[in-house]
UniProtKB/Swiss-Prot annotation:
UniProt organism field: Thermosynechococcus vestitus (strain NIES-2133 / IAM M-273 / BP-1)
Pfam entry (one): ResB
Subunit: May interact with CcsA.
Gene coding for it: ccsB
Protein known as: Cytochrome c biogenesis protein CcsB
Main location: membrane
Length: 442
């Protein structure tokens, strides 16, 4: 059984604003580290970019980086623990501060004596003022009014007291979305040649509770690139089919950058491309195919190449180089000398053999992601915007008391003091007899 005093102390500690600010600061720093440091890269990448001597900032080497989990910040136990603690702090703050404030705001009572009005920041006395006229004026300005024969209470903007609770609830939704995504989400990368079908195999990141779908596969019906007049890439496209375990198509769509295909909570993004193979004929042979591999250019562009034997004993051949899918291939001899260029459908003679270029086969690079927390993210941000707007609504209260042919009027608000004062002054002047000058004492 939970000890009540201990529970209250823990609740008070978690609800401390200073703790919430500290947790938020640490989360922000950790998130910045996850943004600056490349996530999910290979060991060799971190060894090359974060050497031990000299270490970055004197301490951040690849060993420290991996030990702290900075290569996958958002899935580390300590980062998720920070999110849970911050969520607990928000919950405690809501229960100990915001909910009691809302409950107090909903409680009200009539003022029964004139001296009670002196405690209000805004109050005045209207000779021969009418309580009924006051109620009518307040209703016209959107107040909800309760009254007896001699007493009145009115309020509006109670939703403003609900705003902070909605903001806290939205932040909890966002945190829950982040935790759910880290635990159950995954990301895969696949490089698939046109016409091929694959299951998800190359998993880059996955949460401990992630379920990788194996009951469907992805088929690339076609991959193509649109080029500008200058020969630069304008956009690349993939015509994809989702197939069930029996090979039946269950969904089809064409994707390009920033326009994914979604199926079963999984999004398939166009992320990269390559040249998978070259198809050709030698003399009158059937169409043959050789795979092409990316070449190391030292950062000077992208090239793909392969070696084509022109003799059965592999004693002679040519190197084929391509830089894009526009259909041009460069041929080089055994000593690296340039021989000729060849376009799709054209032929040339090499080492006594007629080589005909049929086509270059492109491959599409897909980034495949599942994040079950995204709906909670969207709901949380929508709720956050609503809560912020609600928080800007002023909660205004007005009391009235009619006694000895005098109307005592007073009120208070939690924000927009000047606007409330002007509103109360206007009401007081409306109720005052023509011969009287009424002012609100501050």
């Amino acid at each position: 059984m939970i000890n009540a005093p201990v529970f209250r102390r823990v609740l008070a500690l978690l609800g401390d604003l200073r703790l919430a600010i500290l947790l938020l600061l640490v989360i922000a720093i950790a998130s910045m580290a996850g943004t600056v440091i490349e996530q999910g890269q290979s060991l060799s990448f971190y060894q090359a970019n974060y050497p031990e001597n000299p270490a970055l900032f004197g301490f951040l080497s690849w060993r420290v980086l991996l030990a702290l989990g900075l290569d996958h910040v958002y899935r580390t136990p300590w980062y998720l623990t920070l999110l849970v603690l911050f969520g607990a702090s928000l919950t405690a703050c809501t229960l100990t501060r915001q909910v009691p404030a809302l409950t107090t705001a909903q409680r009200w009572h009539y003022y029964q004596e004139p001296r009670q009005f002196t405690k209000l920041a805004l109050s005045t006395t209207i000779p021969q003022g009418s309580l009924t006229a006051l109620a009518t004026a307040l209703r016209a300005k959107g107040y909800r009014v309760w009254q007896t024969d001699t007493q009145l209470y009115a309020r509006k903007g109670l939703v403003g007291r609900l705003g902070p609770i909605v903001v806290h609830a939205s932040m909890l939704l966002i945190l829950l979305g982040g935790i759910l995504g880290a635990l159950t989400g995954f990301m895969a990368q696949e490089l698939i040649p046109s016409g091929e079908t694959v299951h998800l195999q190359h998993i880059v990141e996955a949460g401990p509770l992630a379920r990788i779908p194996q009951d469907w596969s992805v088929k690339v019906n076609r991959f193509w690139i649109d080029y500008t007049d200058a020969g630069e890439i304008d956009q690349f496209y993939s015509d994809l089919s989702i197939q069930d375990a029996k090979g039946q198509e269950v969904k089809r769509g064409t994707i390009h950058v920033n326009r994914p295909l979604r199926y079963g909570g999984v999004s398939l993004y166009q992320a990269d491309w390559g040249i998978a193979a070259i198809r050709f004929r030698l003399n009158r042979s059937p169409v043959l195919q050789l795979p092409m591999a990316p070449l190391d250019t030292g950062g000077k562009g992208r090239l793909w190449g392969t070696w084509l034997p022109t003799r059965p004993d592999l004693s002679a051949g040519v190197s084929l180089i391509a830089r894009d899918l526009q259909g041009t291939v460069l041929l080089y001899g055994p000593k690296g000398e340039f021989l000729t260029s060849l376009r799709t459908g054209m032929s040339t003679e090499v080492n006594g053999v007629t080589l005909t270029l049929v086509e270059l086969v492109g491959s599409t690079g897909l980034q495949i992601k599942a994040d079950p927390g995204i709906p909670l993210f969207y709901a949380g941000f929508a709720l956050l915007m609503a809560g912020v707007i609600m928080s800007y609504v002023s909660h205004s209260q007005v009391w009235g008391l009619q006694e000895n042919q005098r109307l005592y009027l007073g009120g208070r608000t939690n924000r927009a003091q000047l606007a409330f004062e002007q509103e109360l002054v206007a009401i007081a002047r409306e109720l005052a007899p023509p011969s009287q000058t009424t002012a609100v004492d501050l």
